[in-house]
From Swiss-Prot:
Transmembrane segments: none annotated. This is Endonuclease NucS. Cleaves both 3' and 5' ssDNA extremities of branched DNA structures. It comes from Corynebacterium urealyticum (strain ATCC 43042 / DSM 7109). Pfam families: NucS_C, NucS_N. The gene is nucS.
Amino acid sequence: MRLIIATCAVDYVGRLEAHLPRADRLIMVKADGAVSIHADDRAYKPLNWMTPPCTTTEYRRAEALAEATDGKDPFLTLPELEDEDVEALWVVENPKGEQLRIQLFAVHSDQNFDLGEDPGLQKDGVEAHLQELLAEQIEILGEGYSLVRREYPTPIGPVDILTKDATGATVAVEIKRRGNIDGVEQLTRYVELLNRDELLAPVTGVFAAQEIKPQARTLAEDRGIRCVTLDYAAMRGTDDSEFRLF
């Protein structure tokens, strides 16, 4: 884990465009390559981020000037370095060509920490039981769904449930008692990873929970992830309510 406190400006270039003007912020770089930009508010939510797989390349203004030859403009391809106040430019790019372009004006703190391997979030009793019940009642997800397996292993952790829909397409299911943004991010990583497997692709995601926070639902829908609200009592057979599908 690398934590940098810096005066920076950030531009996101991709499906949309977004700009963060010059200010002091926290830049977090994780061991898996993820980069996120944080302000001193908004709780845990970053201002902008890039999830793995992605690459980060650093360009320094002094080096660009030193390498310039034959009168060529050293800033032709890196216009952000033209500002004399900029010390460096980070270009964080994913395979889709989306970029975070981070101008560093001053670095106030730069620290690295080895956190080791995390044991992962342990599901509580309700989540574990929801997974078991949904595997037994997989038709809740839709007519024609069939179970592939529970706890489908991946290099970044097990997918709660892997299924096939009525067309035979692969669907990864993440189950939570309370669905928040972290759960959507987790499922996004699983879907991106599974889509690299030609035997499974194309893979879509379903985010299933007893309760799904509005922000999590918005993020999921923006990423093409379907949300399903689960009625725990009905699934256990202690309630006659119909399952709610959104």
